[in-house]
UniProtKB/Swiss-Prot annotation:
It holds the Pfam family ThiC_Rad_SAM. Its EC number is 4.1.99.17. GO terms for biological process: thiamine biosynthetic process; thiamine diphosphate biosynthetic process. Pathway: Cofactor biosynthesis; thiamine diphosphate biosynthesis. Keywords: 4Fe-4S, Iron, Iron-sulfur, Lyase, Metal-binding, S-adenosyl-L-methionine, Thiamine biosynthesis, Zinc. [4Fe-4S] cluster binds at residues 408, 411, 415. The gene is thiC1. The keyword Magnesium does not apply. One of its GO terms (molecular function) is zinc ion binding. Catalyzes the synthesis of the hydroxymethylpyrimidine phosphate (HMP-P) moiety of thiamine from aminoimidazole ribotide (AIR) in a radical S-adenosyl-L-methionine (SAM)-dependent reaction. Belongs to the ThiC family. This is Phosphomethylpyrimidine synthase 1. It is an enzyme of class 4 (lyase). Zn(2+) binds at residues 268, 332.
Length: 428
């Protein structure tokens, strides 16, 4: 039985107990969430992974994406990025390579970390077709499903699969047009294949067969967002919503067959539309875990898109988004390097926490309360221990060391907190 089927039979599995302990919640709450499709717990029969729950009532989780490109193929560097992402606090990792030996590189990455690892199988299928036949449009349907199964057997825990692109979605896209084009690589591959071959998307047409593969290998389905906007002016358009409707219907079908499902959301969304997107997705999908790719709230800050994303991600999480894909400073410019990956994870972890302070004020604000008291008391060691990045905080302070060890060089002898502590008591 799958974990969904266990949960629906009233069985609390070891994975549910681990999530409950990690979140400080009752195991029965986790079981009910998995049974209803509101919580997923990625696992694999092929490898031991760090158990992580994603969904309603749980802390907002952060995914880091890595992977070689056709221009830069350095498997060892991708392993270092994966390990750095885990060390920086990423909850999951997606390996999205589009160059080199797909399975060999992915296996190397999977074997190097304990996190759940996700992938996009159609990248491999389409790019191998281009290598073999000279064009992505010559890929066969069998090759697409074989790539999916091959990646599942490696121990891939969740897969972004572009199930919601079909002929109806395509009609909406062509009729409405786009200011920023189609930014999803998977969406670009699949729509090009459909138009050239005059056929339906095989992932949609053969959805039940796809679900059989995922169920056999205990892979979480993440319904790919191939119609997401690549510019804020295209956000929440007809093609995006059409795909969401289809993916929500397919998510229900997969869950009824015992497969865990995450529904993916958009990546470029102006701030005033974030709440609408989260609420709409949650209602349409029956409150399945919602995964947002960023989101970016403006398009004019290349080089600073990790900051743009932190703004959007914190608001998304506050409205109920469960799962955030990080964005690095290299977004829209280059393949991220090691430092970009670390910065992306840290920035998104901050955003997730900020959102959780709104979603779960009783639970998520305890660390901030402790930090406030530590600052009041000028307890620097306590401040470091509570910081999201203790080593960075120490490094910054020590690089400009104060004469007075109680204060910092911002205020020096005129530290407001020290003055108050010397003259009266504000402890609470």
């Amino acid at each position: 039985m799958t974990i969904v089927e266990d949960a629906q039979k009233g069985i609390i599995t070891e994975e549910m107990k681990i999530v409950a302990k990690d979140e400080g919640l009752d195991p029965e709450f986790i079981r009910r969430g998995v049974a209803a499709g509101r919580i997923v717990i990625p696992t694999s029969p092929y490898r031991q992974v760090k158990i992580c729950g994603i969904g309603e009532g749980l802390r907002t989780k952060v995914n880091a994406s890595i992977g070689v490109s056709s221009d830069i193929v350095d498997a060892d560097m991708e392993v270092k990025k994966a390990q750095a992402a885990e060390a920086a606090g990423a909850d999951t990792l997606m390996e999205l390579g589009t160059g080199g030996d797909f399975l060999a590189i992915r296996k190397k990455v999977i074997d190097s970390i304990s996190l759940s690892v996700g992938s996009v199988p159609l990248y491999q299928a389409f790019i191998e077709a281009a290598r073999k036949y000279g064009s992505i449009v010559d890929m066969t349907e069998d090759e697409l499903f074989k790539a999916t199964e091959d990646q599942a057997k490696l121990g891939t825990n969740f897969m972004a699969i572009h199930t919601g692109i079909n002929n109806i979605t395509m009609d909406r896209l062509k009729a409405h047009g786009r200011y920023g084009g189609l930014c999803s690589r998977g969406g670009a591959f699949m729509t090009s294949w459909m138009l050239h071959n005059e056929k339906e998307n095989p992932l949609y047409a053969n959805f039940d067969y796809l679900v059989e593969i995922l169920k056999e290998h205990e892979v979480v389905l993440s319904t790919g967002n191939g119609m997401r906007a690549g510019a804020v002016h295209d956000a929440t358009d007809r093609a995006q919503i059409q795909e969401l409707i289809i993916n929500s219907e397919l998510a229900d079908r997969a869950h009824k067959q015992g497969v865990q499902v995450i529904v993916e959301g958009p990546g470029h969304v102006p701030l005033d539309q974030i709440g609408t997107n989260v609420k709409l997705m949650k209602e349409m999908s029956g409150h399945k875990p919602f995964y947002m790719l960023g989101p970016l709230v403006t398009d004019i800050a290349p080089g600073y898109d990790h900051i743009v994303t932190a703004i959007g991600a914190s608001v998304s999480a506050s409205y109920g988004c469960d799962f955030l894909c990080y964005v690095t400073p290299a977004e829209h410019l280059a393949l991220p390097n090691l430092e970009d990956v670390i910065t992306g994870v840290k920035t998104s972890k901050i955003a997730a926490h900020v959102g959780d302070m709104v979603k779960y004020p009783d639970r998520a604000r305890e660390q901030d309360l402790a930090m406030g008291r530590a600052r009041r008391d000028l307890d620097w060691q306590k401040m470091y221990s509570l910081a999201i990045d203790p080593e960075h905080a120490k490094e910054v302070r020590n690089s400009r060391a104060p004469e007075d060890s109680d204060a910092c060089t911002m205020c020096g002898n005129f530290c407001a907190l020290k003055i108050v502590n010397q003259n009266y008591n504000l402890a609470k």
